[in-house]
Amino acid sequence: MKKGFTLIELLVVIAIIAILASVVVVAFPGATKKAKDSRIVSAISQARTVMVYVYGNDGNYDNYSCTVPADEMPPLCAEVANNHPTKGTNPTIATCTTCDVNSGPAACIYSLLNAKASYWYCADSTGKAGFTGTDPSTACAGAASAKCPADITG
């Protein structure tokens, strides 16, 4: 009596493994998008720390951008750009000197996310940071505000 598996038994096991692997591969893109979103959120959170540092040193946000190498923003902007739904798109940064009568300088940074359509992550100089379904371009990028939308959820 010989011991071992027949060719048919091995083929059946390989077929079962292939079916299980295909189920995992179908679920994989969602996980990839969530991982990219986590990288974007992390980079923007670090960029908010840089925002506080720039204001503390300069008293304004004039040097808070993706192009000023001294403030450590270029690598953070590159991280967002590499994980943005439209690869290569930097986060949007907005600053204003006198946003309104009652406040001084302000800044905000935001980026579109991958996992949910029309969903952004935004952080601003007032301490607000979180997810929003409202396009931040009107509030954050508006020269009179530079603040995240009111519906931010953490």
Briefly describe each language-model feature range.
Residues V52, T95, C108-S111:
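Structural recognition of the beta-strand scaffold that forms the well-ordered cores
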Residues S103-G154:
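Short, surface-exposed interaction loops/tails
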Residues R39, V101-G104:
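A generic fold-level signal
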Residues G30-N82:
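Conserved hydrophobic/amphipathic alpha-helical signal-anchor segments
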Residues M1-F28:
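N-terminal single-pass transmembrane signal-anchor helix
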Residues Y61-N102, D124-S125, A141-G142, P149-G154:
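Polar, enzyme-active/binding microenvironments
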